[in-house]
Amino acid sequence: MSAVIRVDSLNKTFARKQALFNLRLEIQAGEMVALIGASGSGKSTLLRHVAGLARCDRDNGGSIDVLGRRLQASGRLSGEVRRLRADIGYIFQQFNLVNRLSVLDNVLLGFLGRMPRWRGSLGLFSAEQKRQALEALARVGLADFAGQRASTLSGGQQQRVAIARALTQKAEVILADEPIASLDPESARKVMDILADINRHDGKTVVVTLHQVDYALRYCPRAVALKGGRILFDGSSEYLSEGFLNELYGAEGDTPLLFSDRARRGAESQPELTLARA
């Protein structure tokens, strides 16, 4: 089966400091994959390259294909990048909504990649597009907020609006960069539940960067662990051992963040997660 995402020998250097080292990765259609690792490990940098938001090195930079089409190679984006981006939904950590617009108008922006630019610039959305946008908001539990300004919503609600926008975009691949990093545990669970539902019921490929490993274990069957710009683990999440995770994140600093959800809530509403032993 052809990979939906294929990363081949990807290298990236910032100001003479290499951030990604010869990364190779294939993700198949319908997978839900977590990219995990400490801050600065390269997981967000990798995701931005897969989205076409960053370019690999010009010399020996490698290549990235998405949905069977070349996205970029050797520091150059493909001429098809605009059409490819229409098939790639990107969810940012800080929501990336237009605060002065209504919730509904923000969701309607998901249609821009699939309509003439002049119509989009004038905000000429059809009645059918508005119906679909309201349907997407209903799916994330926010239909009643359609007329409110985006700035009035909580962080968790804004992130769900961003997911609704990806639904109207009709993206085949959804990339989410630390979508729950700034959210409280209840909001984080709602966001991850929605992403998992999109993966299971719509068959969309979902790749999400996560800092808290308990969410990766709970929601993502496959995990890819990065450290220092290199892939150290790629396989079933159930085989992530405590010893490996301590090595990945370090014995101090990042380690307390790994299971912050369970630490804050206790285990009364979720089954205990057991890590595989090395």
UniProtKB/Swiss-Prot annotation:
Primary location class: membrane
Binding site for ATP: G37, A38, S39, G40, S41, G42, K43, S44
Protein origin, superkingdom: Bacteria
GO cellular component: plasma membrane
Membrane topology annotation: Peripheral membrane protein
Domain ABC transporter as annotated: residue spans: 5-253
Similarity remark: Belongs to the ABC transporter superfamily. Phosphonates importer (TC 3.A.1.9.1) family.
Subunit note: The complex is composed of two ATP-binding proteins (PhnC), two transmembrane proteins (PhnE) and a solute-binding protein (PhnD).
Protein name: Phosphonates import ATP-binding protein PhnC 2
